[in-house]
Structures are given as structure tokens and as C-alpha cells.
Amino acid sequence: MNEELLRLKNLCVDYKVKEGYLSAVKSVSLTINKGEVFAIVGESGCGKSTIAHSILRLLPDRNEVVKGNIFFNGEDINEYTDKQLEKIRGKEIGMIFQNPLDSLNPVYTTGFQVAEGIMLGNVTREEAWNRVVKLYNDVKMSDAEKRTKSFPHELSGGMRQRVMIAMMISRTPKLIIADEPTTALDVTIEAQILNIIRKLRDDFNTSVMLITHNFGLVAEVADKVAVMYAGEIVEQGTVFDIFDDPKHPYTKLLMKALPRKTKHEGRLKTIDGTVPRLTTDIQGCRFENRCPYKIDICEEIDPSNIIVSESHSFRCHLSEGGESDE
């Protein structure tokens, strides 16, 4: 039986801008179970990272408004004070940021920075240092003991990402949020990072929220997938649901736009049009201006969430069967 770890219920995030409020995330609901890799995919600017940062209250200071519920281990941490949230940030929920060089202090060795978190658990400096070496070995860092004395700028992008992963697992969090963890890494290093993520899930029953636009990455490691467009989740299901039986027009078009290995596919397919301005009060479906299947109702009414199966749902007026949960 699946045991729930994280549940978002009607999460909304608005940023205050000159024109008013920008609806960056609208009514997002999802559940991540223990030991599960849950991928959130979509094009740049769709709200993926905003969801991740809102969980740990790391949003930029833009007079943001966060509404909805963020349940972690059964408690709504969106109601926590900053002091309460500090107790689980890093310890219970860890985050791997997109650019590890920006996340590491350039004036301290990487080993010192990893050990710093370990010593919060009342262990000696020697014990912490030995643990750092072991962690570096666990994440397949070559010449681990030597690398603990390296500064961030002395390491490659792949090695810096390993340092960040070692830092996150040093306190064995229940949930790791990985925000584009393989961006700018070559395919060999990417494969190694994927193996580390799998090992985390298998060895420690760690749950992973994987933020990415890379469908290849999703196919390799994800158990469940949510597809985002313009701040909304338009479809979610198991990785097999999304890849083998996509329902939402946007998901279908994304799948058709994926590069193929054969030379008989012709020109690379694209999705016409642009994302709507999220500062306006959008009536109807947010994808209607780009959808080749749209009907009149799409411009006027926000689509309901259609339940295809226990694991699979999508938001569209072209329901293709299934029942509405609204």
C-alpha cells in the first residue's frame, strides 16, 4: 500500500508585478508517496520551479501570495512559522538546485560545507569528516578524500552536482527536491546522476520531486509524471500513462515534438503560438490559443479535471471518456 509523504492541495502562487498579479501557479494538486520519484515536466516558465521553491518557502522576495495546502507527513507546513519550517528544511526536505556553483560557498572547501550540516547532529569533527568521505564515495566521486579539500571552482559541473547530492543525503531527508539536476551536464555524467537518484530511492526509500523539461530523464527514473503548462497541471499519471496513452492535447503535442532517432520522421515538430500572458484574467483553457482541437467552450470555461483511471487524469473539454471529479 502506498504511503503518502507530500500532498499539495490547490496550491496557488501569485507574484505582484507592475500590471497587477502574475498567476505563476494555479490550483496545483498532487501527491508524492514514500519511495517514489515524481517528475514535474513542462517548458521554461511554466511554474515548475515555483512549486518546488514554495514548498520550502524559498521564493524570491516579490510580494508573492501563496495559497492552498502543503501537507508533509500529514501536517500542513504552509501554516508553519519560519522557525518551525527551519527544523525540517534540509533535515526532512532537501533540495538540489539547478546550478550547484551558485549554491556552494566559493571560500570554503566542499568537504567543509558538507561536514557543516552533519555537525548539526552533535557529532565530532572527525566523525563528520569521515562521513563526508563516505558520502563522496557513495555518490561516486573519484578520489573522494582528495576532493573533500577542493574548492567549488576546482571541480567540474558533474562533481559539483555530486557534492550537492552528498550534502542533501548527509541528513537522510525523507524528500529530495531536484530542480533540473542534470542541466548543462554531458550524457555520461547525466547517466551517473540518474543512477545516484535511483540508488537513493532504493536504498533509503527516499522520495524525489524531479523538476525537469527533459523527457528522456523522466522516462529513465520517474514513477509518476505531472505535465505543466502556464502554471497549471494539465495532465498527470504514471510514466506509462503519460508516454503510452497521453490524453491532453498539450501532452500529445509535446510527445510528437520529441526528437526521434530514425531519419524517417521528417522535420522536428513544434507547437505553434505562445504562452498567454499570466497577468491577465484568463477565461477558459490556458492552452486554447495554441490547441489544434479547440472548440467554442474552450475560450469561455475552465476545463474540469477528467479522471481516466486511479492514477491518470487530465484537464480538457475533449474528455475522450472518463468522469469529472468536479
Regions found by a protein language model. Give the residues of each.
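Short catalytic/signature loops enriched in Gly
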Residues: 4, 145, 236-326
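Conserved ABC transporter NBD signature motif
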Residues: 64-76
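P-loop NTP-binding/switch modules centered on Walker-like glycine-rich loops
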Residues: 43, 177, 181, 185, ...
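Conserved ABC ATPase signature
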Residues: 150-155, 159
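A short, proline-enriched helix->beta-strand linker immediately N-terminal to the Walker B motif
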Residues: 170-174
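Conserved ABC ATPase "signature" region
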Residues: 76, 126-146, 255
